[in-house]
Amino acid sequence: MARSIKKGPFVDEHLMKKVEAQEGSEKKQVIKTWSRRSTIFPNFIGHTFAVYDGRKHVPVYVTEDMVGHKLGEFAPTRTFKGHVADDKKTRR
């Protein structure tokens, strides 16, 4: 279910403060965050976030196409190793 339009998009305050602090500086550092639930705003474009996936921080560079999505969508939490191959051919 989508979030109510009345409420507006959600972003953690501490994350917004970190982005606004870097807006004035020339050198953009990687912003480390655990907030996977935060919505990507237009002023996040061009910044790199290190989003926590449960084990490590995954670098996510924000582009125009990502606006409106959540940060957690771009840092998968599960590693897919592939299905086990069928051994019927090798048993014969």
Curated annotation (Swiss-Prot):
One of its GO terms (biological process) is translation. GO terms for molecular function: rRNA binding; structural constituent of ribosome. It holds the Pfam family Ribosomal_S19. It comes from the Bacteria. Keywords: Ribonucleoprotein, Ribosomal protein, RNA-binding, rRNA-binding. The keyword Ribonucleoprotein applies. InterPro entries: Ribosomal_uS19, Ribosomal_uS19_bac-type, Ribosomal_uS19_CS, Ribosomal_uS19_SF. GO terms for cellular component: cytoplasm; small ribosomal subunit. Belongs to the universal ribosomal protein uS19 family. PANTHER family: RIBOSOMAL PROTEIN S19P FAMILY MEMBER (PTHR11880), SMALL RIBOSOMAL SUBUNIT PROTEIN US19M (PTHR11880:SF8). Protein S19 forms a complex with S13 that binds strongly to the 16S ribosomal RNA. This is Small ribosomal subunit protein uS19. It comes from Staphylococcus aureus (strain NCTC 8325 / PS 47). The lineage of its organism: Bacteria, Bacillati, Bacillota, Bacilli, Bacillales. The gene is rpsS.
